From Swiss-Prot, chain B:
The modification O-(pantetheine 4'-phosphoryl)serine is found at S37. Its main location: cytoplasm. Disulfide bonds: none annotated. Pathway: Lipid metabolism; fatty acid biosynthesis. This is Acyl carrier protein. One of its GO terms (biological process) is lipid A biosynthetic process. InterPro entries: ACP, ACP-like_sf, PP-bd_ACP, Ppantetheine_attach_site. Keywords: Cytoplasm, Fatty acid biosynthesis, Fatty acid metabolism, Lipid biosynthesis, Lipid metabolism, Phosphopantetheine, Phosphoprotein. The keyword Phosphoprotein applies. Carrier of the growing fatty acid chain in fatty acid biosynthesis.
């Protein structure tokens, strides 16, 4: 089950921990994967680690803060892969945290641009072909804070909540063509950023997670692999909360 | 039939997968040719691409039949 042989997937933000894990998992399920991100050297390293022989793996760097980059990326990815995109995983994102009363417009706008407008443009670009081919899978990686909110992240939470509303709308627009659009909302994932927490901070954090541990990038990757599979063909417009039980919206 | 009419017809046949004989000038995309709202948007986008014209939203809304499309594109091309 959940095999992706013959499918081509574009994963943005593939140089990061979660993105790399998603790319690795989709590749392991048989998909041809195109890795995108801003850091070309890191992408190349991830690609080399996924498939040392370069089999079914391609690198297409892109800076999604440039509005023209999304269309260009989809074209470049299809050329690199030599096939139309069956799967889009919107994973790229960034944060510019700060309490609202001190948040600059620039920090609000940058997060909206990269975390919400760019995924929209990528969806729009891939949907044209998917609608024509009567098949396709889009999964966007949001965040638990898009559902619960979080002090210090008004911009990021708004962008991630926006991603959920956008995906529900696209799911309704594309449903009649067999294209599904879903969201995965991760909770706390163990990364370099959470590794530096103090023991007290960590204990407090874990106290709020019924499953008693932080998530691994692979926990997110597995849910993406499921949602992009043929078997998940009757699931659309949903948000899968992968957070150890920290929030149960 | 004009070259534009031929090309419009071909796009409609290809996109909606209907018999060529059904694509008469009076045929309505939605009522006669089985298109849904998404099809009509895709058709307009296909026309835009094929004829290198821009069809704004308010004009696109008025294109209901094959003849509407041909007339609009002929007018744009003549302008």
């Amino acid at each position: 089950m959940f095999r992706l042989d013959g499918k081509t997937a574009l994963v943005t933000g593939a140089s990061g921990g979660i993105g790399a894990a998603i790319a690795r998992t989709l590749h392991a399920q048989g998909a041809r994967v195109v890795l995108s991100g801003t850091r070309e050297a890191v992408l190349a390293a991830v690609a080399g680690e996924i498939a040392p022989d370069g089999e079914r793996v391609h690198v297409c760097p892109a800076d999604l803060s440039d509005p023209a980059a999304a269309d260009a990326l989809v074209s470049a990815a299809e050329v690199a892969a030599g096939a139309p995109l069956d799967i889009l995983v919107n994973n790229a994102g960034l944060t510019r945290d700060g309490l609202a009363i001190r948040m600059k417009d620039e920090d609000w706008n940058r997060v909206m641009e990269v975390d919400l407008a760019a995924p929209f443009r990528l969806c729009r670009a891939v949907l044209k072909g998917m609608l024509r081919r009567r098949a396709g899978r889009i999964v966007s990686i949001a965040s638990i804070v898009g559902v619960t909110g979080n002090a210090g992240q008004a911009n990021y939470a708004a962008a991630k909540a926006g991603m959920i509303g956008m995906s529900k709308s696209l799911a309704q627009e594309a449903g009649s063509r067999g294209v599904t659009v879903n969201v995965v909302a991760p909770g706390f994932i163990q990364t370099a950023m959470t590794d530096v927490l103090s023991d007290t901070q960590r204990e407090k954090l874990l106290g709020g997670i019924p499953l008693g541990r932080m998530g691994k990038p692979e926990d997110i990757a597995a849910s993406v692999a499921y949602l992009v599979s043929d078997e998940a063909g009757w699931i659309t417009g949903t948000t899968l909360n992968v957070n150890g039980g920290m929030a149960m919206p | 039939m004009s070259e534009i009419a031929d090309k419009v017809k071909k796009i409609v046949v290809e996109h909606l997968g209907v018999e060529e004989s059904k694509v008469t000038p009076e045929a309505s995309f939605i009522d006669d040719l089985g298109a849904d709202s998404l099809d009509t948007v895709e058709l307009v986008m296909a026309f835009e691409e094929a004829f290198s014209v821009e069809i704004p939203e308010d004009a696109a809304e008025k294109i209901a039949t094959v003849k509407d499309a041909i007339d609009y594109i002929e007018k744009q091309k003549a302008a």
